């Protein structure tokens, strides 16, 4: 696996991949089996797979979240090699933001709901960095997990609206044996908090509970709910367990077409 740090270095390397399909998996590191599922899809679908690791500072509302975001770079590199990744793009912040975030991408509809309500500016940071990465990598396909379904929806719409050629592929959420959605943030949960978090998906997925009872059961676990609602044919939750914010969603069977 080659590791490249600059846009220029990638552009030179990219010339050797002409005529080949290119899959791209953008990440912020702290890789787990959920990321592995994205990579496996890319390796299966494409001739070449590129993974980026970049902890994007512009999508964090809370400076403590940025400072405390887990970093496991050496293990990440080992995993990427095991997963048969061809290239790791690992830029510094000033490489992707030479303008110091003077230019940005805003969406004024779907980004204002759910996570957008509690994290103003978050999706501006996400969409801006993803547009930059897609323009840099010029991939045939890019892969995003459905755990972050709102993000996936926004990125797919952005790519369509700006006539970008990369196909955006959604990959179903990877979960542990007890149903907890895999997330880098899970590393920050204590054993007791993990036990609590694993109970949330069962409540979220239940079709026998009313909305009121579902909320009550989750609050009785000690979680502080940011939102618990249904839209786009899915049921969404964001809640705090201690200092850690977790999100999840489940399909209700008839999902609204992304457009």
Indicate where each model-derived feature is located.
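Nucleotidyltransferase catalytic core that binds NTPs
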Residues: 2-216, 220, 231, 243
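Phosphate/ribose-recognition catalytic cores of enzymes acting on nucleotide-derived substrates
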Residues: 217-259
């Amino acid at each position: 696996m080659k590791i490249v740090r600059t846009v220029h270095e990638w552009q030179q390397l990219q010339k050797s991949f002409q005529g080949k399909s290119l899959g791209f998996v953008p990440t912020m590191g702290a890789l787990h089996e959920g990321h592995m599922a994205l990579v496996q899809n890319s390796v299966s679908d494409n001739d070449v797979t590129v993974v980026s690791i970049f902890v994007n500072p512009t999508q964090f509302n809370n400076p403590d979240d940025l400072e405390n975001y887990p970093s496991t770079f050496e293990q990440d590199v080992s995993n990427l090699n095991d997963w048969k990744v061809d290239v790791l793009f690992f830029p510094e912040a000033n490489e992707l933001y030479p303008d110091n975030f003077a230019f940005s991408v805003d969406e004024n509809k779907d980004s204002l709901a759910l996570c957008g309500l509690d994290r103003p500016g978050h999706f501006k940071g996400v969409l801006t960095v993803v547009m930059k990465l897609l323009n840099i990598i010029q991939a045939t396909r890019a892969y995003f997990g459905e755990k972050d379904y709102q993000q996936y929806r926004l990125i797919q719409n952005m790519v369509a609206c700006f006539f970008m050629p990369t196909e955006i592929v959604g990959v179903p959420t990877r979960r542990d044996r007890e149903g907890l959605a895999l997330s880098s943030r899970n590393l920050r949960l204590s054993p007791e908090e993990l036990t609590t978090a694993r109970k949330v998906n069962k409540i979220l997925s239940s079709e026998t509970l009313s909305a009121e009872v579902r909320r009550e059961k989750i609050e009785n676990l000690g979680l502080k709910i940011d939102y618990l609602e249904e839209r786009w044919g899915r049921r969404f939750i964001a809640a705090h367990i201690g200092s850690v914010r977790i999100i999840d969603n489940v399909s209700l069977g008839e999902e609204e077409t992304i457009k």
